[in-house]
């Protein structure tokens, strides 16, 4: 387990994307700070400041602003297996009608780690992390399929996690 800064389309798991214009564009210094934290979320502000040309206090202020704006989170990233979650799956969902109410219902479920609206074969893709197969079955069969508007689901159960990283930088 280690800490990383996760700069994402929506650092707030229930909030709107910071890429939809709700936040001003980031300058090169803020992007460099994010990259430093993606490498090590516990990196001292003084070390970041040295790398990006700012004082420790200025880095602290910028990091707080990035957190407050929902541009990034600083989180501990774990291997789900090591903390008791032995079953992960991606679930493709087709919806009748408006996607938002279904996406909102999925977002409220603690087992749903990612909920994305997509173009293609599925309207929504949801990553689910569960304790075991029985838990996964309960989430899909009794909870997801019971959401009004869900027309169909297709599950893609993970057999082996080969890579999990949040090091995409700030391209």
Regions found by a protein language model. Give the residues of each.
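A compositional/biophysical signature of low hydrophobicity enriched in polar/charged and small residues
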Residues: 1-171
């Amino acid at each position: 387990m280690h800490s990383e800064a996760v700069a994402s389309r929506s650092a707030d798991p229930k909030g709107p994307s910071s890429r939809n214009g709700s936040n001003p564009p980031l300058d090169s210094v803020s992007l460099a700070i994010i990259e430093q934290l993606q490498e090590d979320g516990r990196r001292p502000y003084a070390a970041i400041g040295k790398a990006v040309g700012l004082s420790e206090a200025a880095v602290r202020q910028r990091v707080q602003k990035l957190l407050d704006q929902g541009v990034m989170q600083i989180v501990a990233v774990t291997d789900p297996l090591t903390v008791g979650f032995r079953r992960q799956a991606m679930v493709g969902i087709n919806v009748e009608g408006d996607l938002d109410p279904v996406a909102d219902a999925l977002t409220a479920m603690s087992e749903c780690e990612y909920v994305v609206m997509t173009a293609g074969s599925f309207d929504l893709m949801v990553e689910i992390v569960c304790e075991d197969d029985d838990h996964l079955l309960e989430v899909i069969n009794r909870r997801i399929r019971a959401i009004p508007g869900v027309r169909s689901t297709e599950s893609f159960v993970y057999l082996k996690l080969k890579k999990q990283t949040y090091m995409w930088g700030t391209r």
